[in-house]
């Protein structure tokens, strides 16, 4: 059976990257929350 995690940087960026977060209202909410928590890394 194939493992579920097959790492690919492009897919990682497209799904969880900064621009995909900024594209939706919910994504911007995530970024604001992570900023308020003081996360150094906001996205993938």
Swiss-Prot record:
Coiled-coil region(s): none
GO cellular component: ribonucleoprotein complex; ribosome
Ribonucleoprotein in keyword set: yes
GO molecular function per UniProt: structural constituent of ribosome
Stored InterPro entries: Ribosomal_bL34, Ribosomal_bL34_CS
Keywords carried by this UniProt record: Ribonucleoprotein, Ribosomal protein
UniProt-listed GO biological process terms: translation
Keyword Transport annotated: no
Matching PROSITE patterns: RIBOSOMAL_L34
Family in the record: Belongs to the bacterial ribosomal protein bL34 family.
PANTHER family, A to Z: LARGE RIBOSOMAL SUBUNIT PROTEIN BL34M (PTHR14503:SF4), MITOCHONDRIAL RIBOSOMAL PROTEIN 34 FAMILY MEMBER (PTHR14503)
Protein name in the entry: Large ribosomal subunit protein bL34
